[in-house]
Amino acid sequence: MATSKVTYLGDLRTSSIHLASGSEIISDAPIDNNGKGEAFSPTDTVANALASCMFTVMGIKAQDLNVDFSNSTAEVTKIMGTEPRRITEI
């Protein structure tokens, strides 16, 4: 069964719908790659997904240990390479 439906909206923007909940993520190409930069870029979501995944695993362990992990934060920095354009560091 599919998890999401991604639709290209034009102008280097996509809409991703989570099929189980209906929640939506909009992505937009960054200004330095011909986009408007008005939303997370696809590579931003990759970097943020890594932090979210780490926090989810840490939250599971915190629950097991009866430790309050709520309100923990992370700042995510993504470094892009060129030729080809790619994530080189998170």
What are these regions (language model features)?
Residues 53:
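Short cysteine clusters
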Residues 1-48, 56-90:
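Extended beta-strand/beta-hairpin segments
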